[in-house]
Amino acid sequence: MSQNVDEKVVHDDASVIRSVDRSESDSYPDSVSPEGAEPSEEEMKTLRRVARRVPLACWLVAIVELAERFSYYGLSTPFQNYMQYTKTDHPRGVLGLNQSGATALSYFWQFWCYVTPIFGAWVADTYLGKYNTISIFCVLYIIGILILFVTSLPSMSQNTSLGGFITAVIVIGIGTGGVKSNVSPLIADQVPKEKPSIKVLKSGERVIEDPNLTIQNVFMFFYLMINIGSLSVIATTELESRVDFWAAYLLPLCFFVIALLALFLGKKVYHKVPVGDKVIAKSFKCSFLALTKLNYDAARPSLNPDKEFPWTDKFVDEVQRALYACKVFLIYPIYWLVYGQMTNNFVSSAGQMELHGLPNDILQAIDSITIIIFIPICESIVYPFIRRFTPFRAITKIFWGFMFGAAAMVYAAVLQHFIYKAGPCYDSPNDCPGFKNIPNHIHVALQTPAYFLIAISEILASITGLEYAYTKAPVSMKSFIMSIFLVQNAFGSALGIALSPVSKDPKMVWTYTGLAVSCFIAGWVFWFLFKHYNDREDKWNDLDYEQDDGYNGELEPVVSLTRSFKDMS
């Protein structure tokens, strides 16, 4: 009797399988993979892709970044006024370096903050690991903010404030370099390393859970936290305007303690990738050998067994993939030069307009608010909609990021033209006889579209760049390759320093126009050079699954934002 039952069950199961095969054979000519299985080649081409849930450990890392960015943007946003004006000017300042001098020093600040990640990444990937490096550099960060706070007190002389400011900028820059190069790889490290798999939705639709989309969503979420933190500009600019600069710098100093607290609480929760054995030196040796022989096969142990190379064939493939990514980053300095206008020349332009009681540097919050609103929209609506028709690959996103950046500069040039057309000072705002410190008659709200366009360009170019740097780097070099991406911002700032002599009235229309043309051309050059990388994306990503790195990928997922907050409380 039991044998007959077993035979019936087997027969019924076979019937079900045949039924599924018949019902889906038109869409999927190959065999249908069961839920949880790795998709077939045909399914990879035809099924829609979705992301997995964001692991809980990512939230603690995100809190570290939120607190650090709260402090970074909160203290740096008042910098332009602090440097440009004196205590008797309107807007109020301290150092009195004028617009071109303040813009040059502002670009040095950005340059320094984005060249130091190279050092921070080297320390992490070679000696201390990401977690320990972040912890140590956070202490340096706090020391720098403390110096800035003390030397901005009203009792300090202008020379003392200038010396303290330069010292603080150097120390904070070292601190942010150690944090910035490691915190984004650390948050992505918390995502389990799993192959794509089949999932059946409640609607019955069969989809592919794609780990690369999960990484994409993690970086979108990461960037969301950055911009929530950057809303500190609202508080610090108000404190600067209504109290003084010392109050604006005291708030970031106090808030940074949250970053240290999140690091401490997550110490036993974070997945920490082991430090590689001189992995950066190995990668340079491998690359040098391949370049001198004009072929990466010359560095493969399997093809050169007599050489006894201290790496594997997979490592050679990973280094080659990373170099492709680094080539993509070479066009980014033009984009970062455009992006940098938001923190200096846009602020100066706002100071030439009627503010109606607002601080001239508060409008930077529009950029953050736009990103906070549009990241969830892009993640849940725009990107999935586009993926229904065509893969929306990284190179395509970055190209459109350049185009939106160029559009922002076009708008800024047109707006500056109308600022110069408005009285009473026309092309010498705030600085004509009889109208000293009187802005031209044009409303500051007209700057809003420029910040909006910059924000959309960030979602497309900046977030995708972070994702590209992480996914194309070898396992033990995530921080170093991330620092290569970040250092492009430093090169953009160096271009800004060279441009600063013309960043003054009445030349700003041509400054913005030149930036618009440069960004537009750079975007198209980028597209023609790298558009074929889109076709290699899946092949490069598959390299991560060729062998196990020892990480079992067991992390608790976040089911929803609400539940994750409850779990943390």
From Swiss-Prot:
It comes from the Eukaryota. Residues 1-43 are annotated as: Disordered. It is found in: Cell membrane. Disruption phenotype: Leads to a marked reduction in the transport capabilities of di/tripeptides. Results in increased resistance toward the peptide-nucleoside drug nikkomycin Z as well as the glucosamine-6-phosphate synthase inhibitor, L-norvalyl-N3-(4-methoxyfumaroyl)-L-2,3-diaminopropionoic acid (Nva-FMDP). One of its GO terms (cellular component) is plasma membrane. It catalyses: a dipeptide(out) + H(+)(out) = a dipeptide(in) + H(+)(in); an L-amino acid tripeptide(out) + H(+)(out) = an L-amino acid tripeptide(in) + H(+)(in). The keyword Glycoprotein applies. Keywords: Cell membrane, Glycoprotein, Membrane, Peptide transport, Protein transport, Transmembrane, Transmembrane helix, Transport. Its main location: membrane. One of its GO terms (molecular function) is transmembrane transporter activity. Glycans are attached at residues 98, 212. It is a multi-pass membrane protein. SUPFAM superfamilies: MFS general substrate transporter. The keyword Methyltransferase does not apply. GO terms for biological process: oligopeptide transport; protein transport. Residues 1-25 have a biased composition (Basic and acidic residues). The chain crosses the membrane at residues 54-74, 104-124, 134-154, 159-179, 215-235, 245-265, 322-342, 366-386, 398-418, 444-464, 479-499, 510-530. Belongs to the major facilitator superfamily. Proton-dependent oligopeptide transporter (POT/PTR) (TC 2.A.17) family. Peptide transporter that exploits the inwardly directed proton motive force to facilitate the cellular uptake of di/tripeptides. Shows strong uptake specificity towards the dipeptides Tyr-Phe and Leu-Gly and the tripeptide Phe-Gly-Gly, when compared to PTR_A and PTR_B. Also able to import peptide-based antifungals such as the peptide-nucleoside drug nikkomycin Z as well as the glucosamine-6-phosphate synthase inhibitor, L-norvalyl-N3-(4-methoxyfumaroyl)-L-2,3-diaminopropionoic acid (Nva-FMDP). This is Peptide transporter PTR_C. The gene is PTR_C.
